[in-house]
Regions:
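TPR/TPR-like (Sel1-like) alpha-helical repeat modules
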Residues: 42-46, 79, 94-115, 141-147, ...
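Repeat-mediated protein-protein interaction surfaces in helical alpha-solenoids
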Residues: 5-6, 32-41, 65-75, 111-125, ...
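Catalytic glycan-binding domains that act on GlcNAc-containing polysaccharides
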Residues: 15-18, 22, 35-46, 185, ...
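Generic helix N-cap/helix-start motif at coil->alpha-helix transitions
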Residues: 13-19, 31-33, 45-54, 64-69, ...
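Extracellular/periplasmic ectodomains of large secreted or surface enzymes and adhesion receptors
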Residues: 334-383, 445-453
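Residue at a conserved register position within TPR or TPR-like alpha-solenoid repeats
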Residues: 28, 61, 93, 143, ...
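Alpha-helical segment of the N-proximal tetratricopeptide repeat
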Residues: 1, 138-142, 200, 204, ...
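Single conserved hydrophobic/aromatic residue that forms the stacking wall/gate
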Residues: 2-8, 12
Length: 453
């Protein structure tokens, strides 16, 4: 009937409008108002990248255009996602009479807020009463550790004199500017051993290819978390220098630099422990020490690719100490993940001429399949493919993959990606699933026809 076809047409138009609005709201520097964001979020809470939309919505808030009570209500029980949002929420609390809570939020938000040149001037003036020198120093430290050199440069002039000299040196080291030596010489004595300054000096030397003088810094500093401030940042430099020292056959120093990392958790900790174990086993012939490092690595990872790596290298370490039963147990552990490199190496250790099979992919309930393919975002994906705009389906497909994992949404999202010839997105969806030990091998390792030239 005419009315049902016009109703269908209206639904279709609304779906297209939603998608265009979503893309618009995700574009930085757009002209949308906070209310545009609010309307979209109220109607489309099931869209992809909603956290990012909320983050950008916070940057549209202002107590001049939205009442403080409305701002407080909008955040509700949720913490702001941005430093900017924290400041505006803090200002709203002050305006309704809660000065303590408001000031605390402004101070916290100021440290991490993403501010343009004009916004920095504006908020610096606006929050003059609530911010002190300490807040400026904290912001400078945050920006410096994150390598935000342009934002740091804008802030330096507002710092107390001794800190201005310290952060000017850090800024020049970061930006490889002229006058680095003089800037370092100008740093007050009390900051000569500042962790951030040493980190930026190390990075500067390493980028210039100065392995020996980089090593000098790493051997001289204290290696505890308290001193290093961001041991995870230091790790990247340690790893590069440590490998460079292996090429120079300086194995003991290489081990010392990789193992004195000052971390106790996180992905960088796991990387440091694996590398230290590998150096101990392969270059220092010390399987006992290697074992401890590999155990630390194994106990701090969860992805199959890393679990198989840890188990395989534990197998190697126990093999070296002659504990064959323990060695084989660890190899067996690694073979639980046969789609990984180390899982396959471990399988060959136990079955030198053996063949292995992968598990079958999961079956999908036909009812759920129909429900899935009727979703608005699925239809949008097909439309984008027809319009040759399939690059925009990436986040949509990843979002759809989480719809109902138990019923097979990951498989169906990968199938959808394959049907619009985005094998790369199908692989992404399957790879993310594999991190949680769910293997969809048909889509993770697609068989494609040979390209014709």
């Amino acid at each position: 009937t005419l009315s049902s076809s016009s109703a269908a047409s209206d639904v279709y138009k609304r779906q297209i409008y939603n998608f265009i609005q979503w893309r618009h709201l995700l574009t930085s520097g757009n002209q949308a108002s906070f209310y545009d964001y609010q309307v979209f979020l109220n109607k489309n809470s099931d869209y992809p990248r909603i956290s990012r939309v909320k983050y950008l919505a916070e940057h549209k808030l202002s107590t001049e255009s939205v009442s403080p009570k409305k701002i407080i209500k909008w955040f509700g029980e949720n913490d702001p996602l941005s430093g900017y949002g924290k400041m505006i929420l803090g200002e709203s609390h002050i305006l309704i009479g809660d000065k303590n809570k408001g000031t605390k939020l402004i101070k916290e938000g100021w440290v991490t807020a993403d501010l343009s040149k004009n916004e920095l001037k504006y908020f610096r003036k606006k929050y003059k009463k609530y911010l002190n020198a300490d807040d400026y120093i904290k912001r400078a430290d945050y920006l410096a550790w994150n390598g935000d050199r342009w934002d740091l440069q804008r802030l330096i002039r507002y710092l107390p004199k001794d800190y201005e000299l310290l952060y000017n040196a850090r800024h020049l080291l970061m930006s490889k500017g002229y006058g680095v030596d003089q800037a370092i010489a100008n740093v007050p004595q009390k900051f000569k051993n500042d962790a951030g300054l040493n980190y930026d000096r190390l990075k500067w030397r390493r980028k210039k290819g100065r392995v020996d003088s980089s090593t000098e810094i790493l051997l001289k500093i204290r290696n505890d978390k308290e001193y290093l401030v961001r041991p995870d940042k230091w790790w990247k430099e340690r790893e590069i220098i440590s490998r460079a020292l292996l090429y120079k056959k300086k194995y003991e120093i290489s081990y010392k630099i990789s193992s004195n990392h000052g971390m106790t958790e996180g992905s960088e900790y796991a990387a440091a422990e694996w590398m230290s174990g590998w150096i101990a086993l392969s270059f220092l012939n010390d399987p006992m020490t290697a074992k401890d490092h590999f155990k630390n690595f194994y106990e701090n990872v969860s992805y199959p690719i890393s679990l198989s790596r840890g188990a395989y290298w534990l197998g190697r370490a126990y093999e070296k100490t002659g504990e064959i039963e323990l060695s084989n147990n660890w190899y067996r552990e690694a073979t639980k993940y046969l789609t990984t490199y180390y899982g396959q190496l471990a399988f060959l250790k136990l079955n030198p001429n053996g063949k292995f099979e992968l598990e079958k992919d999961m079956e999908i309930d036909p009812k759920y399949r129909i429900q899935f393919f009727n979703k608005e975002l699925v239809k949008i994906s097909y439309l984008l493919d027809e319009l040759k705009k399939d690059k925009y389906t990436k986040h949509i497909l990843r979002h759809l993959a989480n719809d109902n994992i138990a019923k097979g949404s990951e498989v169906l999202a990968a199938e959808l990606a394959t049907s619009i010839n985005r094998y790369d997105f199908a692989i992404q969806v399957s790879k993310i699933a594999s991190y949680q030990k769910r293997f969809h091998n048909k889509y993770n390792y697609p068989i494609i026809s040979t390209p014709k030239y």
